[in-house]
């Protein structure tokens, strides 16, 4: 994790920019770099900053912002296949002065332009300033693992890893986005929109890049935002002709390969362990890979981290039994935290300062507690199990989506099930539809339309 910041403006100086960059010191405690590029004919100044947290190539040669000829990059991320990409660039005649993936990203862009990201495996948020063309390129990884925000008023422009840094720049308004707040209260976090809770500040969405340039009169050109990747293009149903056991074996192979790619690090590494299938699989594969690399004393080499709920009135979400069982079976160390209500009250200001926007549930705070525990234990890189529920259908809400697609017999027989105002069938249907599928307002609207369409007694809903 690192922090990136940049702006194009006539309104701020070096002191203000450095103060804004300092708000992200936690993202890069190992160093700080700033590049100042006065655009003399235009009266604007380009500031490009970086807070460094190195997990690959920690030498000074990898210092950022990094310049190669007319191109300057500030980069937060990790390209897992950077060594292979470097070999390809060397074959094209490129030479390298560092062992960093930062240099590989920059020279890949010089060689291929935005198309370079098609070959990247990993996570990234970066900005490249082309001093010759007076052009800025911003990009974010396919799934939005790395954060990237920006602000533009047509005259000034800024980008950052975190909102708080933008708010310290004079030309960025310090005001709430009322429509964004209303939308959050009605529908939950705007995960699939570029809006934030702050006026004028946008997210660069996952799988997108942004491009603009300084015009001859010093004004900013229109911002062009392009989507460079769509997962739909990769998952269209195909008749592969393979059996279910063959599909399982392919999945196992790809999962193991993904974990292996994430071992590209020069610092201590841990693994999150929730007790579920996804994180448990990660821990088992990670331990196996480390053993293959002849790592000694595995109990010391691999540490796992978990959130547990041992002292809660409702222990239905506590998975400590599975966590302890797997830790003992694999012989790995496990560190546990318990995110209680008292813990939340004691840490709410710090949590919100880091989170910056409202969250959709308490699980985000639990994740924050685990991350803090990881940091306290000196672990710099931690493998997590995020994403498995999305592509393996692990959420209750997917039941509703399945029904809406008209692919389930239950949905086709909907009117028949409620014939004669059968309250028992209705209750079963409501349970089947899943109480986790929609927000309260969405469910209320759905059931209101249901009663009107089929002439049902609304008192059934009150039960």
Predicted regions and their residues:
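Cysteine-centered catalytic environments shared across enzyme families
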Residues: 1-349, 353-354, 367
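Glycine-rich active-site loop/lid subdomains used to bind and stabilize high-energy intermediates
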Residues: 155, 213, 310, 324-463
């Amino acid at each position: 994790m690192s922090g990136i910041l940049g702006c194009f403006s006539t309104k701020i100086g070096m002191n203000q920019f450095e103060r804004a960059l300092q708000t992200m010191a936690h993202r890069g405690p190992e160093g700080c770099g700033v590049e100042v590029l006065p655009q003399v004919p235009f009266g604007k100044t380009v500031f490009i900053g970086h807070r460094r947290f190195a997990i690959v190539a920690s030498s000074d040669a990898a210092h950022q912002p990094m310049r190669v000829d007319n191109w300057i990059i500030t980069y937060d991320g990790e390209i897992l296949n950077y060594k292979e990409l470097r070999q390809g660039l060397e074959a094209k005649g490129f030479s390298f002065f560092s062992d960093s993936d930062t240099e590989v990203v920059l020279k890949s862009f010089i060689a291929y332009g935005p198309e370079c990201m098609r070959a990247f495996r990993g996570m990234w948020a970066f900005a490249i300033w082309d001093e010759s063309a007076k052009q800025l390129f911003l990009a974010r990884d396919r799934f939005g693992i790395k954060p990237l925000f920006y602000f533009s008023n047509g005259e000034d422009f800024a980008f950052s890893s975190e909102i708080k840094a933008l708010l310290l720049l004079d030309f960025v308004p310090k005001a709430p986005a009322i429509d964004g707040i209303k939308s959050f209260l009605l529908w939950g976090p705007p995960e699939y929109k570029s809006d934030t809770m702050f006026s004028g500040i946008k997210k660069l969405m996952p799988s997108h890049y942004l491009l603009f340039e300084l015009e001859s009169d010093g004004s900013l050109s229109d911002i062009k935002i392009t989507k460079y990747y769509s997962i739909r293009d990769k998952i269209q149903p195909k008749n592969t002709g393979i059996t279910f056991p063959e599909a399982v074996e392919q999945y196992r192979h790809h999962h193991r390969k993904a974990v292996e790619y994430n071992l590209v690090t020069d610092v201590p590494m841990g693994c999150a362990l929730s007790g579920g299938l996804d994180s448990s699989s990660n821990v088992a594969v990670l331990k196996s890979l480390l053993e293959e690399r002849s790592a000694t004393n595995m109990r010391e080499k691999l540490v796992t981290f978990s959130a547990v709920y041992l002292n809660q009135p409702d222990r239905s979400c506590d998975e400590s039994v599975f966590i302890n069982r797997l830790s003992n079976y694999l012989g790995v160390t496990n560190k546990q935290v318990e995110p209680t209500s008292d813990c939340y009250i004691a840490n709410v200001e710090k949590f919100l300062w880091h989170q910056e926007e409202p969250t959709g549930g308490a699980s985000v705070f639990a994740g924050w507690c685990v991350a803090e525990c990881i940091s306290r234990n000196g672990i710099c890189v931690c493998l997590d199990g995020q994403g498995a529920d999305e592509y393996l259908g692990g959420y209750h809400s997917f039941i509703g989506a399945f029904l809406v697609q008209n692919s389930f017999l239950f949905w086709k027989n909907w009117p028949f099930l409620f014939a004669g105002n059968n309250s028992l069938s209705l209750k079963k249907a409501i349970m089947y539809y899943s109480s986790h599928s929609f927000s309260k307002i969405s469910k209320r609207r759905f059931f209101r339309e249901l009663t009107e369409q089929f002439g049902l007694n609304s008192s059934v809903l009150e039960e």
